[in-house]
Amino acid sequence: AEIRGRIRGTTDLAVAVGETAWVQECVFEKIEVKREVFAELDAKTPPGAILASSTSTFPGSTFTAEVKGRHRCLVAHPINPPYLVPLVEIVPTPWTSPETTVAAREFMAEIKQVPIVLKREVPGFIVNRLQVALLGEAFRLVEDEVIGAVDLDHAIADGLGLRWSFMGPFETIDLNAPGGIRDYVERFGQPYYEIAVGQSPARKWNEPLVSKVEQERRQVLPANQIQERQRWRDLYLMSIVANKNSRRED
């Protein structure tokens, strides 16, 4: 109640951002719209305010180049659903000041998020690039009749995902060989490379393939139950996050 009492709505942008220290832009994924919004934010916010974008794919340099105060602009990309997943990707542009990047990371850590800072811009940042690689192979395996979509999901949910929910891929392989990561690479580097060669080139997710995966998904989850399943997802995520937080305190 105390927090809600400090929140008020307004349709006047100048009123909304006139005294703020941080702005989180969440408009449509259209560069032209973001350019207009950032130009307006730059004119209506205090000089020291950080202007952050929630964009999922566009480097900040594509829509902040002409902003007068571009040194205080960057990307702070949250992960869906952002009210439960703590990770935030901090992506400075070539002209973002080091002070802005440091302040952004400190602010996110202060509000109990888990910020990671990219050393330079790349399209899609980190999480989406990893997700694109995994989804690309998942669709390929289904298209090539290697496995069905439902069993593919089990490979992550009941396999890799269990470890990945509390360890990253490098820590995973570091612990999967007696001598650590170098030992792992010496054992599996060549066969993994040969597999990777077979995963090129990238394929588009064509309509017949999407229809095939969708049909499998609708068999296990009818469309009218998606919202209910989203609530289930959120509750499950809450329990995972709570468990991780409790173990960090151990």
Features from the language model and the residues they span:
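A short alpha-helix-loop-beta-strand transition element characteristic
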Residues: 1-2, 99, 147-149
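Active-site-proximal catalytic alpha-helix in oxidoreductases
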Residues: 82-91, 111, 116, 120-146, ...
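NAD(P)-dependent Rossmann-like dehydrogenase/reductase catalytic/cofactor-binding core
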Residues: 102, 113, 149-250
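Rossmann-fold dinucleotide-binding core
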Residues: 53-120, 124-128
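Rossmann-like NAD(P)-binding element
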Residues: 1-51, 58-59
